[in-house]
């Protein structure tokens, strides 16, 4: 399967980015370690699991090295990009409880939710030691996320107010634009 990744563009509608190869210079799980990501996501009730290096990743929508979601499990291999793990984790956080209950592979959601997922992904990276927001934005650009203003940084700093408002309205960030470490309830 081609490695296409949905990202907000122009009016924050999801679109497919260019296919990316395994050689993309992004942080991978093997460089960060499962424990760091699992610790970050524990308050969300997500269980992080690492599969074998040659195993297919259960629940991976895009296949290849992309992270997978099955119920409350975030699955990855050593070569899974950290941005992919955070992106899928943020889908879990942003989806409604009924979608979480039946979750297997396809996180679904609408265009506004996809924007919120990308925004929260950057915020959460700021809480991962040795990664931070800047590196996450660089990796998102390197992987092919596409935004109207060109770069993830430009979008995040100057064009993502609607994503932030969506997160605030659903109780997922506070007034200081910090994660609340809660799941969406409605």
PLM segments and residue spans:
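Active-site recognition of the HExxH zinc-binding catalytic motif
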Residues: 83-96
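Short, mixed-charge aromatic SLiMs
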Residues: 110-112, 142-151
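Short, amphipathic alpha-helical segments
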Residues: 31, 111-118, 130, 134
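Secondary-structure capping and boundary motifs in well-ordered enzyme cores
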Residues: 74-82, 109, 113
């Amino acid at each position: 399967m081609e490695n296409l990744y949905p990202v907000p563009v122009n009016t924050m509608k999801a679109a497919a980015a260019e296919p990316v190869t395994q050689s993309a210079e992004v942080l991978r799980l093997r460089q960060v370690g499962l424990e760091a990501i699992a610790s970050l996501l524990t308050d969300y009730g997500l269980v992080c699991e690492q599969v074998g290096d040659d195993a297919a990743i259960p629940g991976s929508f895009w296949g290849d090295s992309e992270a997978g979601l099955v119920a409350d499990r975030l699955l990855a291999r050593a070569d899974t990009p950290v941005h992919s793990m955070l992106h899928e984790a943020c889908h879990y956080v942003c989806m409604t409880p009924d979608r979480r209950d039946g979750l297997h592979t396809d996180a679904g959601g609408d265009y506004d939710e996809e924007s919120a997922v990308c925004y929260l992904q950057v915020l959460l990276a700021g809480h991962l030691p040795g990664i931070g927001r800047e590196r996450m934005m660089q990796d998102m650009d390197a992987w092919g996320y596409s935004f109207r203003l060109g770069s993830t940084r430009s979008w995040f700093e100057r064009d993502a107010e609607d994503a932030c408002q969506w997160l605030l309205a659903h109780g997922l960030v506070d007034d200081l634009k910090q994660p609340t470490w809660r799941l969406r309830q409605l």
